[in-house]
Amino acid sequence: MTSERYNAREAEPRWQRQWDEKAIFATKNDDPRPKYYVLEMFPYPSGRIHIGHVRNYTLGDVLARFMRAKGFNVLHPMGWDAFGLPAENAAIERKVAPKAWTYDNIAAMKKQLRSIGLSLDWAREFATCDPSYYKHQQKMFLDFMQAGLVEREQRKVNWDPVDMTVLANEQVIDGRGWRSGAVVEQREMNQWVFKITKYSQELLDALDGLDRWPDKVRLMQRNWIGRSEGLLIRFALDPQTTPAGETELKIFTTRPDTLFGAKFMAISADHPLAQAAAAKNPELAAFIAEIKRIGTAQEAIDTAEKQGFDTGIRAVHPFDPSWTLPVYVANFVLMEYGTGAIFGCPAHDQRDLDFVNKYGLGNTPVVCPEGQDPASFVITDTAFDGDGRLINSRFLDGMTIAQAKDEVAKRLEAEQRGGAAVGERQVNFRLRDWGISRQRYWGCPIPVIHCPTCDVVPVPAKDLPVVLPDDVTFDKPGNALDHHPTWKHVTCPKCGGKATRETDTMDTFVDSSWYFARFTDPWNETAPTTPDVANRMMPVDQYIGGVEHAILHLLYSRFFTRAMKATGHVAMDEPFAGMFTQGMVVHETYQKADGTYVNPAEVKIEVGGNGRRAVLTATGEDITIGPIEKMSKSKKNTVDPDDIIESYGADVARWFMLSDSPPDRDVIWSDERVQGAARFVQRLWRLVNESVAAGQEAPSSRPATFGPDALALRKAAHGALDKVTGGIERLHFNVCLAHIREFANALAEVLARPAKPAPDLAWAIREAAQILVQLFSPMMPHLAEECWQVLGQGGLISEASWPQIERDLLVEDSVTLVVQVNGKKRGEVTVASNAQNPEIESAVLALDAVKLALDGKPVRKVIIVPKRIVNVVG
């Protein structure tokens, strides 16, 4: 009998050292076994892991350990998404070089990750800021360039004049830079873009085949790609009201059926027609300047008050030359979508209705719901966007929406103006090409040279990587690469003249769009991938990460894989066969009377007759228990993983993260439940030790027959094995843990019996204990290794095969059925599992509860749902 209590603090580092010394998690690329690639989204090296990391990486580790035990060649690597703005901010605020800050953080976080006991192949580790990594990224940039997947184009960008950098739409808040607070300017700048739109339809169509992705993620990508079928219409402009040189206004609409309900046209502030009109209208120019000050993100525009300015320009209705529509500049029309212009049909679009109600333009319903009298159908404050038939639409009246769309398209396609059709059927996508230029130092350098004679010249492959200089300063705003006195000055590789390097660096999303492929052979010094290895190990069988990455990261990775295929680096289209989005870890918030947030470690929870009460541990001061929210530093409701591991051990943290909630839902942090997990660890330790003692008289070989007690325990063991196996395969980890607890209770009940177990039961106890340890080994690997040794098993449990299920033990001798009378539950009945319907009916009708419920009424019929319910109808 070993120590009474399990000592995680001593055991966990010891087993981690053994795993490392034996390199048991190293993956061999030439292993003949079937491969299984499990990958969690790699972390940004901020300096500390948070409790959400523990959950994310535990989920993947359970799967990796399980599949390894099932006989797969498991690839489970780890690396670092290491470029990005925080490193530059640290350089500015703390006077430390981005490189030093990043690698120091990596060292600290790697130590933390190791303490969790993850079965990672650390030999494949890399950081995206390693020149040996981004060398290959630069190579692929040039390959994509040659394949026509990279271009340089003028783009309107958000320019922060203080930080002197381009901001993403999401970084513009109320018209100001998120960090500097400066009023953001709109500028035209040369930007490098990846031509993701070449794959718009393919990226959309392929979503149907990603059947192991969450539906919500596929829907988010579908909406982001945003395919829409419609009609491009060329509205003529009234020459009496239009600036010189402007003759028409093109709009794309998905609702050409509503043309006779049009009340206005609206154009973006960036539309050439708006600029032409503003040149001679100071009030319009001022309006355009004002609306550009709001955030340019779609969310900001959607929530802003709808505003417009009548330019005085009139557009001619394509079906009636005497009917003209006012052209407004509106703050809700974006140049990036469609043509930057729309026609407004307020009766059938809520945004348009709000607009006309504000400006008094009126509305005319042109689609009437079925069964409604067209004469009395009016629209006031709520637009009608449902199905119906056309009204108030001349030759379209009485048609369905689909018929009307087709009729409008046919007529406008047939009508010519200036040698071209007035209407053209088109497919549009919301997806835009991916602008990757960033005016930042800490990113992957873009491998091109600008020569006054030769224009843009790719850096020769022999000169890669273009390495970031270390001797940079951040003493003035803007891009440190641009300020560097020597780095950007080079000789043109084409003509030998003076030239300059590109000083923009790549968007950090590029770094994470192919790292999964690099993990397949990170030792290849000459190419981004070793194709035969990548094609064998890819795609990732199970990818795990937050839903916040559902669109950009996952969509960019899907594009990048296709681009890598087009340039010969991989052979597959999709990078991730399975995608799982885990929930967050959330926690109560605690506040003092003055509203100051307090860290949970400083709070003591007292439970009494009046419920839960929180006090400040140091002073006894009452603390308000606030709502359960996402962990954040600002609300101080964070938990330090190091503290939990130090206090309870990694296995307790892992078990808690898996136990309370389905893994795709948020888990509420609870100190009480963490303590419950710690108690369960000790209980398992005692059960295993007691099983060893109880099994001392067990025969060395399997008994020929088993008595009822031994058979019942074996059924419980193999039933749990079957349920946990299926649960892990379906990623239902919390359900697996419930089955493990249930099985542990069954074993404990047998061990609690005072009588010495018979030899067959002693053998069954040893088997049950071994299966129990193997079942919890993916979740609590350190405890499992310790228990494995106590059981006298050779080697490491991390290298052991998953136990085989004896299917004949899963067949139940009896089954318990719910009994209903006229649909209301009246009791239960237990019958032989192979009982026929007449036997079941007899047993049910003999029940006193059934006789009482029938109260002498004759039985009309008995409905039997096999192995579930019997309903007596009286």
From Swiss-Prot:
Its EC top class is ligase
The primary location reported for this protein is cytoplasm
**InterPro entries referenced in this protein's UniProt entry, alphabetically:** aa-tRNA-synth_I_CS, aa-tRNA-synth_Ia, Leu-tRNA-ligase, Leu_tRNA-synth_edit, M/V/L/I-tRNA-synth_anticd-bd, Methionyl/Leucyl_tRNA_Synth, Rossmann-like_a/b/a_fold, tRNAsynth_Ia_anticodon-bd
- Signal peptide extent: none
For this UniProt record, the keywords arranged alphabetically read as follows: Aminoacyl-tRNA synthetase, ATP-binding, Cytoplasm, Ligase, Nucleotide-binding, Protein biosynthesis
User: Which CDD domains does this chain map to?
Assistant: Anticodon_Ia_Leu_BEm (cd07958), LeuRS_core (cd00812)
Its annotated compartments are:
Cytoplasm
GO biological process, alphabetically ordered: leucyl-tRNA aminoacylation
Q: Would I find Cytoplasm among this entry's keywords?
A: yes
Q: Where is ATP annotated to bind?
A: 633
Cellular component GO terms held in the UniProt record: cytosol
Motif interval(s): 'HIGH' region: 43-53
Please give the catalytic activity noted in the UniProt record: tRNA(Leu) + L-leucine + ATP = L-leucyl-tRNA(Leu) + AMP + diphosphate
Q: Where are the transmembrane segments?
A: none
* Protein EC: 6.1.1.4
Q: Where is this motif: 'KMSKS' region?
A: 630-634
GO MF terms held by the record = aminoacyl-tRNA deacylase activity; ATP binding; leucine-tRNA ligase activity
Q: Output the superkingdom of the source species.
A: Bacteria
Family named by the database record: Belongs to the class-I aminoacyl-tRNA synthetase family.
Q: What is this protein called?
A: Leucine--tRNA ligase
Q: Which organism is it from?
A: Bradyrhizobium sp. (strain BTAi1 / ATCC BAA-1182)
